[in-house]
Structure formats: structure tokens, C-alpha cells
Amino acid sequence: PEVMKLEEIDRPVPKDDEVLIRVRAAGVTASDIFIRGSQIPLRMRIPMRLMLGITRPRKGIIGEVLAGEVEAIGRNIQRFKVGDKVCAVTGFSLGAYAEYKCMKELDSKQGCVAHMPANIGFEAATVVAYGGALALQFLERARVGQGRSVLVYGASGTCGTIAVQLAKHWGAHVTAVSGTSHIELVRSLGADAVLDYANQDSLEPGARFDFVFDAVGRAKTSKLKEV
């Protein structure tokens, strides 16, 4: 925080295929912390440094998840109108910590924007956008669907809660792992079985899953074997 500062910049003007969002809430994600502190895993350090900046972030304004209202639209915009409440993941374009952010209407490498669920506020929408984008990406890549078995590790967090719901929605059998205090929450999301972190031995030896979704990066990979 001590290296961050407030600064006045010009308000961006949306291009023909962009919407201008008045940011009402922005999330601070693990990715933001890694980018700001250059805390990048060793195997990804060189390509990520080249992409994001060698000695400091190439983008002066970081932040990759936001929620707000559409302030203006380009002439080719069809899905959104001024006043719409939206949430967005900015991708490598970053910029969510600004007061205004231009986003392309259609999903791209520079992020994606969507209408906010009507029953949540701006702060909650940033969580849905971040967790939802990550969970959706990996579950689609794993082709999770009817008849597949999924283990969600970290099922009560931002990504895990959405992963459980998406996997169930697509017809998978979901086994979830969470802390003791969140077991009922995770069960209410539709998990078929819920295991406690404190008693992971309850998972039967040799248990098989089509896909393991590790939302916290702490799963004991020595116990996992690709089959």
C-alpha cells in the first residue's frame, strides 16, 4: 500500500465496440498482490515479467475485477445500455482500481463484462465475477459434465463455491472439501459429499475423480495420481 498513490487522469472515451464503466467497487485479488509485488511463481516468472513489466507493473493502474454502472457506450454496442449495472474481469488490461474503465462488449483476451445479478450489490458482484470467471474457465477446459466426478478442494472460497454450483448444474457428482465451519454452506450449494479439512482421511484410499479442482493451491499432490 505504501507504494500506491492517488492521481488524477483523463476519463477514458469508449471506442465503437466498448462500454465505459463507472467503477463502484473493485476487488483486491491474489493476482493483484502477485503483480504489485512481482511475487510470480518461478516457472512463470520470465513470461509474466515480459508481459506485465520487468521491474514494475507496466500498467500504472492495476486491478482485474470490478463492478459498476455503464456510463457511456460505443455506437456498435448491442448488449448494454447506459445505466446498466455490470461486473467485469479486466484480464491483462488491468485498470480496475480507476474510477472509470473501458471494456470491450464481447469477451476477449482483455477481459469480459456481464450484467450483474439483480439480487446482489456491487461488492458481492466483484466476487462473483472473479470466482466465476476462474471456475468457469477450468471446468470448461476439463469438460466437466453429466456423469463426471469432481473433487473441489477449497469449496467454501470465492472460486470453490462457484465451482461446486457449476459442476452440479452440469450434472457432475461433486465431492467438496472445506473447513468445519463451512460444511453446511457447501452442502447447501449442492455438493453430493462434503469432507472436512481436519479429517481428510475420510476420503477413501484409492478414491477416483475425473477432475480435481484445487481452489487454494494446497492440495497434497503426492496423494493425487493421474489416471
Question: Where does each model-flagged region fall?
Answer:
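Glycine-rich beta-strand-centered segment in the early N-terminal region that forms part
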Residues: 10-27, 41-93
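Extended, non-globular alpha-helical segments
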Residues: 24, 105-142
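Local beta-strand N-terminus motif with an aromatic residue
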Residues: 83, 98, 113, 191, ...
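A structural motif shared across PLP-dependent enzymes of the aminotransferase-like
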Residues: 92-107
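Mid-domain Rossmann-like dinucleotide-binding core that forms the NAD(H)/NADP(H) cofactor-binding site
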Residues: 125-198
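Glycine-rich cofactor phosphate-binding loops and adjacent beta1-alpha1 units
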Residues: 175, 189-227
